[in-house]
Curated annotation (Swiss-Prot):
UniProt-recorded name of the protein: F-box only protein 39
Pfam hit, one: F-box-like
Reported function: Substrate-recognition component of the SCF (SKP1-CUL1-F-box protein)-type E3 ubiquitin ligase complex.
All residue ranges annotated as the F-box domain in the record: 16-61
Keywords attached to this entry: Ubl conjugation pathway
One Gene Ontology CC term in the entry: SCF ubiquitin ligase complex
One record GO biological process: SCF-dependent proteasomal ubiquitin-dependent protein catabolic process
Lineage, opening ranks: Eukaryota, Metazoa, Chordata, Craniata, Vertebrata
SUPFAM superfamilies recorded: F-box domain (SSF81383), RNI-like (SSF52047)
Organism of origin: Bos taurus
Subunit structure: Directly interacts with SKP1 and CUL1.
Transmembrane regions listed in the UniProt entry: none
Record PROSITE patterns: FBOX (PS50181)
Length: 443
């Protein structure tokens, strides 16, 4: 018996060598790429495990937008991965973080051209693709680089669009024409797309009135199987709602709509358009996210009573306007949706007005409300009132997150009161609530 035969005798092997495949696969699943590569050198069985499809179905590839020796190999390793294991991919997420200059955007574009080309040739099972926050309208994206990247992406989507269920181009920042060109690639030669979840939030650049574009409405008419749609309010029009009603009523369940102060949002939408969509898409729930759009007059034009609203987020990002009041929104507008509202998120600077009573009454009126988050100037006793109402069964909250702004640097008094409130309602909080409350100096 030679030396090699002696090495593989069962009595001389480690217990790791006979580890069942299901256990070994789980071990590999938790390892990073570098450790997986090292583990694959242990023996033939471990090397074969490296090619298990389960290990490579999900992948997030992150490219740093800053020149660095530490990140120098990111582009090469991404290509290596796709060439080696790309055929197993089902869910791919690409991140390119804050590109610093045109040299890096060019390197990213060339890498993506190779990556998408290789993936298009070897993969026929990709279900989900996410390429977020590219901000292609920035100056670091020269016209030639941007055009080349879009050409590669469009060609890839034409080939792989029939497999995709999910596509996110969040933060791409394209012109209306460019964005529609990319989205049309999904329905190439088929006149309709199979995508069920589409995220085009911030896909188009700020200041664009996308809702007035016939090209955009024609493009959206190719989506016939949408379950979830995420977009900006500057894309919403009566025509879009009509398209959704005609083509997606049997499937559409969720619409996430972002409205930013810099996006055009003065268009007139008829309540009957929303009512028709809600009547046909009976499972539809709409979630609104407002950023610095806080005035009652603007909100009232957007939040029509015919909309089946599930959640509303209002964030002013610390901006203060002494001529603005949140009170009419809390007392007159939001109670309109008390039968459907389940989540409320507020972040505003109300240093000039107290809103504790109005907020409390709003929570009590929304009987389905289970999530409430607020960052604002509040009295500490507001938290105790909410907990008391919850204990008495007057509201259905399961999540309560509060940041209480104060005008003092020291929050010792507020902290002490909050500890007393916690001790008083500890049993309720620990057993039934996702609870986080803190006092925060707003200097």
């Amino acid at each position: 018996m030679d030396e090699e035969d002696q090495l593989i005798q069962p009595q001389d092997q480690s217990c790791w060598a006979t580890l069942p495949d299901v256990c070994l696969r789980r071990v590999f699943w938790w390892l990073g790429d570098r450790d997986r590569s090292r583990a694959a050198l242990v023996c033939r069985k471990w090397n074969q495990m490296m090619y298990s499809a389960d290990l490579w179905r999900y992948r997030t590839i992150t490219f740093s937008g800053r020149p660095s020796r530490v990140h120098a190999s990111e582009f090469e390793s991404a290509l290596w991965y796709v060439k080696k294991f790309g055929r197993y991919l089902e869910h791919l997420e690409i991140k390119f973080l804050n590109p610093y200059n045109a040299v890096l955007t060019k390197k990213f574009q060339v890498t993506m051209r190779g990556l998408l080309s290789c993936l298009g040739k070897s993969n026929n099972r990709l279900k989900s693709l996410s390429i977020q926050h590219l901000e292609l309208d920035r100056l670091v994206w020269r016209n030639s680089i941007r055009s080349s990247f879009m050409k590669s992406l469009s060609f890839f989507l034409k080939k792989m669009g029939k497999h995709l269920n999910y596509l996110s181009l969040k933060g791409a920042r394209l012109t209306t024409e460019q964005g529609c060109h990319i989205l049309n690639a999904l329905s190439y030669l088929r006149n309709e797309s199979t995508v069920t979840e589409l995220n085009i939030e911030d896909c188009f650049s700020h200041h664009l009135a996308v809702y007035s574009s016939p090209q955009f409405n024609k493009t959206m008419a190719t989506f016939r199987n949408l379950v979830s749609l995420t977009l900006n309010y500057n894309c919403i029009s009566d025509e879009l709602l009509e398209n959704l009603c005609d083509n997606n009523t049997g499937t559409l369940r969720t619409m996430n709509i972002k409205c930013h102060i810099h996006d055009p949002h003065g268009q007139v939408i008829w309540g009957m358009s929303w009512a028709k969509l809600a009547r046909h898409a009976t499972s539809l729930k709409v979630n609104f996210f407002f950023e610095r759009v806080m005035k009652y007059e603007r909100l009232a034009r957007i939040l029509l009573q015919e909309i089946p609203i599930r959640s509303i987020s209002l964030r002013s990002c610390y901006f203060s306007d002494p001529d603005w009041s949140m009170r009419p929104t809390l007392t007159d507008l939001l109670p309109t949706f008390r039968h459907t509202l389940q989540k409320l998120t507020f972040e505003f600077n109300n240093n000039h007005e107290s809103l504790d009573e109005e907020l409390h009454l709003l929570i009590l009126s929304c009987r389905k409300l289970f999530y409430f988050k607020i960052w604002a100037f509040l009295d500490v006793k507001f938290v105790e009132r909410i907990l008391k109402s919850r204990e008495e069964g007057q509201c259905a909250l399961r999540t309560l997150k509060v940041r209480i702004y104060t005008n003092r640097y020291e929050t010792n008094e507020e902290d002490r009161t909050l500890r007393e409130i916690y001790r008083k309602y500890r049993k309720l909080i620990d057993s039934e609530l996702n609870y986080f409350v803190i006092a925060y100096p707003m200097m």
